[in-house]
From Swiss-Prot:
Gene3D superfamilies per the UniProt record, alphabetical: 2.30.29.170, Nucleoside diphosphate kinase-like domain (3.30.70.141)
Transmembrane segments: none
Expression (tissue specificity): Expressed in trachea multiciliated cells.
Enzyme Commission number(s) from the entry: 3.1.-.-, 2.7.-.-
UniProt remark on domains: Contains 2 putative kinase domains (92-225 and 241-373 AA), the first one is involved in autophosphorylation and the other may be inactive.
Species for this entry: Bos taurus
Superkingdom classification of source: Eukaryota
Record CDD domains: NDPk7A (cd04415), NDPk7B (cd04412)
Subunit and partners: Component of sperm flagellar doublet microtubules. Component of the gamma-tubulin ring complex.
GO molecular function annotations of the record: 3'-5' exonuclease activity; ATP binding; nucleoside diphosphate kinase activity
Pfam families: NDK, PH_NDK7_N
This protein's name: Nucleoside diphosphate kinase homolog 7
A GO biological-process term: UTP biosynthetic process
Lineage of the organism: Eukaryota, Metazoa, Chordata, Craniata, Vertebrata
Family listed: Belongs to the NDK family.
């Protein structure tokens, strides 16, 4: 491995003390995983080259947020032509849509996406209005089956995702297989539609045909204008509790496995969305733990170190039941006392313990509202 090869990005950090944005040159050396930072305005070294294990090559793409020693940086642009050529030439984003018939198989589908080398950059479980469904199916306006398509896509929750990799549009279409699930079972038996679809309408998932089509469709589901797009699916009932898949688990590609484990234990995931939290949001959410839990600062840093996935969980007496299913906060203790729990299976340390869950019954609805009413808006 070439230890002198480096990739350069222009990055921005919001300084909460000065209430201004500071711009840096971020250098990443893939040979040894080290980073270096230069202050653009003052033309000086801000961080000398040092090893940093929590940043990986797949994290480096325009628009992503990365955490460098507790500073959350937004990657704005490539810093030199070499980086632009090497990392920007083939990277594409596309829309991956799980249809109502396959939402219960979201874990399996996300696992397939992860194993194919995609990075999941946005995710939201949502419901479409008839108008939103009509706008989505604009290319089928003259088709005789248009009404059937609209009725199906509005019949229940869907999961929209933005996924990223080289040649994303073509690779996602390959994973999907032929549009008709019956044909897919013959021609591409390992494809998503072959495994989880029924026919040409109820065919589990959707992918755009071109890069231009992907850009148009992603604008429908994840508008760049700042409006929140189609409505989330949160029910906000008294049978609600909150689960958050922590950034380290998302980064390690564990989301699909965690979703399958939750479903197989009999819990209903009634809402789900990916969030990129900032420190202020996390401190607000974790306020109840401040001064109570000794690892409070480390908990905060982990939760804004990358994207997390928040869920609304439904079951009778959900808070206590789901909390027991998550297991003790320390995964080592969980592996000894409760080996079948989420933290025992997927956790690493007391901070990187895979999931947060609501601790007190009276906080379940409040935590769900924080994500799906406040942050989503």
């Amino acid at each position: 491995m070439n230890h002198s090869e480096r990739f350069v990005f222009i990055a921005e950090w919001f300084d909460p003390n000065a209430s201004l944005f500071r711009r840096y040159e971020l250098l990443f050396y893939p040979g040894d995983g080290s980073v270096e930072m230069h202050d653009v305005k003052n033309h000086r070294t801000f961080l000398k080259r040092t090893k940093y294990e929590d940043l990986h090559l797949e994290d480096l793409f325009i628009g992503n947020k990365v955490n460098i020693f507790s500073r959350q940086l937004v990657l704005l642009d490539y810093g030199d032509q070499y980086t632009a050529r090497q990392l920007g030439s083939k990277k594409e984003k596309t829309l991956a849509l799980i249809k109502p018939d396959a939402v219960s198989k979201a874990g399996e589908i996300i696992e397939i996406i992860n194993k194919a080398g995609f990075t999941l950059t946005k995710l939201k479980m949502m419901t479409l209005s008839r108008k939103e469904a009509t706008d989505f199916h604009i290319d089928h306006q003259s088709r005789p089956f248009l009404n059937e398509l609209i009725q199906f896509i509005t019949s229940g929750p869907i999961i929209a995702m933005e996924i990223l990799r080289d040649d994303a549009v073509c690779e996602w279409k390959r994973l999907l297989g032929p549009a008709n699930s019956g044909l897919a079972r013959t021609d591409a038996p390992e494809s998503i539609r072959a495994l989880f679809g029924t026919d040409g309408i109820k065919n589990a998932a959707h992918g755009p045909d071109s890069f231009a089509c992907a850009a148009r469709e992603m604008e429908l589901f994840f508008p760049s204008s700042g409006v929140c797009g189609p409505a989330n699916t949160a029910k906000f009932t008294n049978c609600t509790t909150c689960c958050i898949v922590k950034p380290h688990a998302v980064s390690e590609g564990l989301l699909g496995k965690i979703l399958m484990t939750i479903r197989d234990a009999g819990f209903e995931i009634s809402a789900m969305q990916m969030f990129n939290m900032d420190r202020i949001n996390v401190e607000e959410f974790y306020e109840v733990y401040k001064g109570v839990v000794s690892e409070y600062n480390e908990m905060v840093t982990e939760m804004y170190s990358g994207p997390c996935v928040a869920m609304e969980i439904q079951q009778t007496n959900p808070t206590m039941t789901f909390r027991e299913f998550c297991g003790p906060a320390d995964p080592e203790i969980a592996r000894h006392l409760r080996p079948g729990t989420l933290r025992a299976i997927f956790g690493k340390t007391k901070i990187q313990n895979a999931v947060h869950c609501t601790d007190l019954p009276e906080d379940g609805l409040l935590e769900v509202q924080y994500f799906f009413k406040i942050l989503d808006n």
